[in-house]
Amino acid sequence: MSEKETPSPVLDVKKEKNEETGIDEEKSSEDDCSKRSKVKSNPSKFSVNSILSPLESLVRVQQQLLKMAASKSGTPGTNAGVPGAFPYGPGRLPGNYFAGPFPGYSGAQPNWYNGNDPRFAAAAALLPCSIDPVRSAINHQFSMSSMSQRRKRRVLFSQAQVYELERRFKQAKYLTAPEREQLANSIRLTPTQVKIWFQNHRYKCKRQEKEKAMSGLGHSEDGSSPPPDNDDDDDKYSIEMDDKDDEEEEESEKPVLKPSGVFGLPYPPNAAAAAAAAAAAFNFPFAAQGPNPAYYMRW
């Protein structure tokens, strides 16, 4: 009897193992539950709820203010029927929402279509001008006013001014800044107007030369001459330019140094003449001698 009552050590080890595994399983299930609760309690920062949560709090504050204003104004509650069946009843809205035929719909519409919801105001502030009609209209009006201010106007020259300008143009087609200022003061014009007249007149002369060349070819082939181009009226007008346009014209008239093909550096003026004079002064002997045919016959 004593031998049967003694428990076997193998069974005790199994029980301990089973008990240990059971405890481990319970612990693992508790850990899983805690992890899931942590995941639920810590949502992603980039989720829709986390982004809209501050805006929703503002909406709640605004709704409370609206309710307080409605209670102070003394609007009676006329929401008949089951309470809470329709949240947008006339009893829960301010007095200015009762103008429409359907009070509930008129109250819901401004809340969803750019009404008192601050989310729509924040989104409208971030919209570009092409989407926001108010901002686009303001910018369009501002751009039109700036364009009207920069619109160039034509200045009519007198016959005496045109005569003096043509006489000076025959002497020199290009004027320096002091000469231009002196001529402008003598005929009561601005230096910019004188400069523009000279530019227009140079362009007119070049165009007339091209037309004469083309008309000469056409007259020799067909025997008929094209109608003459009367550009005398162009000299009577000048377009007044702004200071910015004047600076651009001065920069365009400056000589441009083209880079060389060796080191990419620009050639100085009169570089070719200086190089030829230096070569002639040294008089290299190998440059004057021609090729020797005997040198090539050896090969």
Curated annotation (Swiss-Prot):
Residues 1-35 have a biased composition (Basic and acidic residues). Residues 1-45, 208-263 are annotated as: Disordered. GO terms for biological process: cell differentiation; nervous system development; regulation of transcription by RNA polymerase II; regulation of transcription elongation by RNA polymerase II. Residues 242-252 have a biased composition (Acidic residues). PROSITE patterns: HOMEOBOX_1 (PS00027), HOMEOBOX_2 (PS50071). Expressed in the 8 vulval muscles, 8-10 ventral neurons in the head and in the most posterior pharyngeal muscle cell, m8. Expressed in SIA, SIB and SMB sublateral motor neurons, and in muscles of the pharynx and vulva. Residues 150-209 bind DNA. InterPro entries: HD, HD_metazoa, Homeobox_CS, Homeobox_NK-like, Homeodomain-like_sf. The keyword Nucleotide-binding does not apply. GO terms for cellular component: nucleus. Keywords: Developmental protein, DNA-binding, Homeobox, Neurogenesis, Nucleus, Transcription, Transcription regulation. One of its GO terms (molecular function) is RNA polymerase II cis-regulatory region sequence-specific DNA binding. Its main location: nucleus. Disruption phenotype: Normal growth, coordination, egg-laying, mating, chemotaxis, pharyngeal pumping and VC neuron synapses as in wild-type animals. Abnormal sleep behavior with mutant larvae displaying a reduced, if not absent, type of turning behavior called 'flipping'. Irregular formation and extension of sublateral motor neuron processes. Belongs to the NK-2 homeobox family. Probable transcriptional regulator that is required in neural development for the normal formation of sublateral cholinergic motor neuron processes. Plays a role in regulating the expression of acetylcholine transporter protein unc-17 in the sublateral processes. In particular, it is required in sublateral motor neurons for a left-right turning behavior that occurs during the lethargus phase of the normal sleep process called 'flipping'. During 'flipping' animals rotate 180 degrees about their longitudinal axis. This is Homeobox protein ceh-24. It comes from Caenorhabditis elegans. The gene is ceh-24.
